[in-house]
């Protein structure tokens, strides 16, 4: 939105992570001027200054030599840039890591083709080649069964493209992420200005979960500072699900923070069922299988049926956790490790995708962190400053 604006836009408190850098790098490669400055209040954030180009998207390459843009495993960047580049001129090619090439993109590609754009892809996934065509002033329908990012991508570009976007099914009207996109579009300073970005509630869930499970040992209460209050983020509701109820839905109750809830569920004094988990299978890894496998290692009793997991209460033990290069697997089990001794996280640097300072926050002394003891593979205590994922 800032790149599409008619002036200079300052974005304060922007999370600085691998996903953010992927988007900034792609826009810079296209020719946008973006200044990145340190945030004096939070070391893990940046203040960005973006020079908007009034809806003019820089020209790509030719069909024989398209402009190459790499998105890593950033699903948001992949989906948003796919729609964004359709409104440029010339030819662009989007690619990512192997897992990104497995993740769904078909509903978005089909909607853009309905709008009149030519997109080449062997299987309606990345890598793909976009032959841009500018505004088309047409209508399309899009399904968000696999990801609400498909609708968000189209809505962000709808005004510039002259698109009328309709969302299929009941999920469209109820999706909190689609509602958040619409709210942001309505309040964004499109003529230039400043926008303060609120903290990410999904990332905050690990600390609320830690506070909850540690309170079972009568530890001092833990509070997450500057908790989001806009009402836009579904995961801001995480605190209302502590202690966990009997049933939690990925579709109706929580977003990504449902993974946090699943991991701490064995510590609840009753059986908990998690339903509507189908989207978890299509993200950074096959998350339903990963959660079941790693929790079982820790001694949890889990039943998988269709798109649900039923978890029984019970005592847990330490285990080596395979993260599948998934940041949320690493962070969820790290939070569990504050309660269960012996949790060992493989490839902890995967948290750089969305929260590079996560382990720093665990180890830093209060009030800036939890003061947790974190050991390396040889049993040596690590300082907080050593735990920032580069």
Task: Place the predicted regions along the sequence by residue.
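Structural preference for solvent-exposed beta-strand-turn elements
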Residues: 1-390
């Amino acid at each position: 939105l800032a790149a599409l604006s008619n002036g200079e836009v300052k974005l304060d408190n922007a999370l600085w992570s691998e996903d953010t850098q992927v988007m900034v790098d792609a826009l810079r490669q296209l020719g946008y001027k973006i200044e990145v400055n340190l945030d004096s209040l939070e070391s893990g954030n940046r203040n960005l200054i973006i020079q908007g180009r009034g809806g003019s998207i820089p020209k790509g390459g030719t069909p024989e030599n398209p402009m190459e843009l790499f998105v890593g495993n950033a699903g948001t960047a992949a989906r948003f840039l796919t729609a964004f580049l359709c409104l440029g001129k010339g030819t662009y090619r989007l690619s990512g890591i192997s897992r990104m090439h497995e993740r769904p993109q078909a509903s978005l590609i089909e909607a853009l083709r309905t709008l009149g754009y030519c997109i080449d892809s062997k299987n309606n996934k990345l890598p793909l080649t976009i032959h841009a065509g500018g505004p088309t002033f047409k209508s399309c329908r899009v399904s968000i069964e696999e990801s609400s990012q498909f609708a968000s991508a189209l809505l962000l570009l709808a005004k510039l493209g002259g698109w009328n976007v309709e969302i299929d099914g009941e999920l469209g009207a109820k999706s909190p992420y689609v509602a958040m996109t619409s709210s942001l579009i309505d309040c964004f300073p499109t003529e230039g200005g400043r926008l303060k970005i609120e903290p990410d509630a999904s990332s905050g869930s690990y600390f609320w979960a830690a506070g909850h499970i540690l309170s079972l040992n009568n530890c001092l209460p833990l509070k997450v500072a500057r908790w989001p209050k806009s009402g836009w983020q579904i995961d801001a509701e995480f605190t209302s699900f502590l202690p966990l109820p009997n049933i939690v839905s990925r579709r109706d109750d929580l977003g990504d923070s449902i993974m946090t809830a699943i991991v701490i569920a064995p510590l609840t004094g009753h059986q908990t069922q998690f339903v509507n988990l189908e989207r978890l299978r299509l993200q950074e890894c096959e998350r339903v299988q990963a959660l079941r496998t790693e929790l079982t290692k820790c001694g949890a009793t889990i039943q998988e049926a269709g798109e649900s997991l039923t978890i029984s209460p019970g005592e847990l033990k330490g285990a080596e956790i395979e993260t599948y290069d998934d940041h949320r697997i690493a962070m969820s089990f790290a939070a569990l490790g504050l309660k269960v001794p012996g949790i060992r996280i493989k490839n902890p640097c995967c948290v750089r995708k969305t929260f590079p300072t996560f382990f720093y926050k665990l180890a830093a002394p209060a009030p800036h962190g939890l003061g947790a003891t974190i050991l390396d593979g040889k049993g040596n205590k690590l300082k907080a400053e050593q735990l920032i994922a580069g």
